[in-house]
Amino acid sequence: LLVFDPKERYTFGPVDFSGSQIREPILQNLVPFKEGEPYFSDNIAELNRRLSASGWFNSIVVTPDIVAGRKSESKQLPVHTRVSPKIKNSVETGLGYSTDVGPRGRLIWKKPWLNDSGHSLEAAGDISKLEQMLDLSYKLPLEENALEQFWMFGGGYKHEDLNDTKADSLTFAATRRWDLYEGWQKGIALKFRLDDFTQGSLDNKTMMVYPEFSLSRTRSRGGLMPKWGDSQRYTIGYANQMWGSDIDALMLEAQYTLIRTFARKHRFVLRSHLGWIETGDFNDVPPDLRYFAGGDRSIRGYDYESISPKDENGDLTGASKMITGSIEYQLRVKGKWWGAVFFDIGRADTNFEFSNLKKGAGIGVRWESPLGPIKLDIAKPVGDSEENGIQFYIGLGPEL
């Protein structure tokens, strides 16, 4: 039992680290207090959180030295921090199935630390019959605040043969990120992409160079199937022929997901997605930047990316604007099993008129597996005389 004398005020002493593969100056800059400041246990918890959030360590033990503090005339408490490195390689998987796309898989390989500066590497691959994608990213944290300030360099390749779209895309990006406050993070990126595509009957090649500004935040409580959480992301990008792009285009996007649980068994998931492209050269906009609605995480009941304007031949062209929303209610049936009902609505078009909105509704089952939520959904269009089929969706992966 540790008992503090309320008449004596303890302060923080020096912080030391043992067992770390990361250089100590980087770790010292993560310490949320200074030597000589009044001791608060919340600061010890915050140091633990920051070290955990770095992703470098498998175990963390932060211990104030009470005995040394009592013996010290200055009443300083040295803080001993013992850590053990995270394994050098980890693999994550995701699996899914839907009526329109068929089976799909995702594989992520991570190297959480490459050197004593805390650099990290991540490769992600997605594969289905209609789309194949490979992304690679390299993260360089800055010594002055490795958790909140870093550079990210990335590149990727995507092949798509879906509906009336055939495209090959090559992308590169350099991004500088900063943490702001209460979990908000801002980023400034310079992006390059080269696309060779056929959309409907139109063949094209487009190169784009553009800066992009982003603001995002993700919060969650409750493990892999959060009981409480939200995710927000807002981006604005601008391509211009003045700096080498083939087209001029202003691109705006906003995404929001909200999760709330009441009385431990009533869970609500709300989603919205808004996108806008302003350009005089829409035929030159790559399909990967155009908007198509429909499918899982969009409007369930419709084929994947099947909602879009059409040309005179009836081929999908993609849209310059999109808005979708979803509300889902889940009820805990027993243990880790949940039932679900949902309603999705939205459209992808050349304007934001709220007529002729596409709607889908359905029911589903959720299971809290050790790997994350596994879901099975059955959905169909609502009030659409041209579409009345039933779609099935099976998925494994995070909701935020």
Regions found by a protein language model. Give the residues of each.
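Flexible hinge/switch segments at interdomain interfaces of large molecular machines
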Residues: 5, 15-27, 228
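Gram-negative/organellar outer-membrane beta-barrel architecture
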Residues: 20, 40-233, 250, 260, ...
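Transmembrane beta-barrel strand/turn architecture of Gram-negative outer membrane proteins
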Residues: 174, 232-240, 247-278
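Extracytoplasmic gating/loop element in the C-terminal half of outer-membrane beta-barrel translocons
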Residues: 77, 264-342, 350
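Second-shell loop/turn segments in exported
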Residues: 13, 17, 30-38, 122-123
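Outer-membrane beta-barrel and related beta-rich outer-membrane complex signature
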Residues: 198-202, 246, 280-290, 353, ...
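C-terminal structured "cap/appendage" subdomains that terminate the fold
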Residues: 346-378, 382-392
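Post-signal-peptide, soluble extracytosolic/periplasmic N-terminal scaffold domains
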Residues: 1-3
